Amino acid sequence: MPNHASAKKMVRVIGKRTLSNRVRKSRVRNSVKAFVAALEANSPIEDAIAAFRKAESNIHKCVNKGVFHRNTAARKISALSGKLKAYDLARLQNEQ
């Protein structure tokens, strides 16, 4: 239990930040799941690209707010981009 007023305030502030960061991380996880679901459902490439852009946007927002380190975000976006590229190549090969 904090004894000083500043420590008590920091407990409150940290609680608010934790809640906000949890919401942001959840938003990223949900958008990534939606992107993966779009790939697994063999949806049109336009839908997959839209889901990718939404996930990428949410990840960048987390970087701007200090929730993710920029290298973590780059790694996540790179992995998603690789999945999108592989999906596109697989669709092109199946069409031929």
From Swiss-Prot:
Provide a GO biological process annotation.
Answer: translation
Q: Pfam families per the record?
A: Ribosomal_S20p (PF01649)
List the keywords (alphabetical): Ribonucleoprotein, Ribosomal protein, RNA-binding, rRNA-binding
Q: Where are the transmembrane segments?
A: none
Q: What is this protein called?
A: Small ribosomal subunit protein bS20
Q: Does the keyword Cell membrane apply?
A: no
Q: Which GO terms describe its cellular component?
A: small ribosomal subunit
Briefly state the protein's biological role: Binds directly to 16S ribosomal RNA.
The GO molecular function terms of this record are: small ribosomal subunit rRNA binding; structural constituent of ribosome
Q: Tell me the domain of life.
A: Bacteria
